[in-house]
Amino acid sequence: MKVTLFVTCLVDMFETNVGKATVEVLERLGCEIEFPEAQVCCGQPAYNSGHVEAAKEAMKHMIETFEDAEYIVTPSGSCATMFHEYPHVFKDDPKWAKRAQKVADKTYEFTQFIVDVLKVTDVGASLSGIATIHKSCHMTRMLGVKEAPGILLSNVKGLTVRDLPNVQNCCGFGGTFSVKMTPISEQMVDEKVDSVMETGADYLIGADCGCLLNIGGRIERLGKEVKVMHIAEVLNSRS
């Protein structure tokens, strides 16, 4: 099975270990990984900021880059969601809407692909400690991926998963929201950190690097001792 990896901007620039872990997990599960070097941003920041025409140019480039893939997998619920929004963005342009739908139909978030396509619930990972899961907004509310991360983590040897209080609440990142609405964003992430600390977890695990960078940065500034990990890193653990 050939998987074309969309690595995302944040992974490429800040969290390269997440990209490496994603590839290694999928390869162990029998996937052949392709990485198109022509890939760029999915266009979400520009689109959400109202720069629709600029965003469309990035989206067209991504459609051209990925439309011949067998499966498209990304370690980001938010970016996967954006791919699924492409047909809506191009709804008034039948030619591009058709090509966008072709891409959207074969785009999966990392854990969604493992559970729903590969039909795997145990990847053989092991990690000792207590964890809690942050469920990112786009991934759960728009993409509809709610259970796959928990299913996979429940089978990680040595890991106990505790429910995160107020799990439905946003962490305050929201891409450009955290820049435009900084005071509100700071209050939201403080509330999220309080919820994490309430669980007594050793690890905070999530599937979107934006959320994890936001929460992790606040945890570090507050001097809390919780390790923040992307779920790909956890599923690649052998400890």
From Swiss-Prot:
Pfam family, one: CCG
Biological process annotations from GO: lactate metabolic process
GO cellular-component term (any): cytosol
A molecular function GO annotation: oxidoreductase activity
Annotated InterPro entries: Cys_rich_dom, LutA
Chain segments annotated as coiled-coil in the UniProt record: none
Family: Belongs to the LutA/YkgE family.
Annotated function: Is involved in L-lactate degradation and allows cells to grow with lactate as the sole carbon source.
Protein name per Swiss-Prot or TrEMBL: Lactate utilization protein A
Species assigned in the record: Bacillus cereus (strain G9842)
Native organism taxonomy: Bacteria, Bacillati, Bacillota, Bacilli, Bacillales
UniProt gene name: lutA
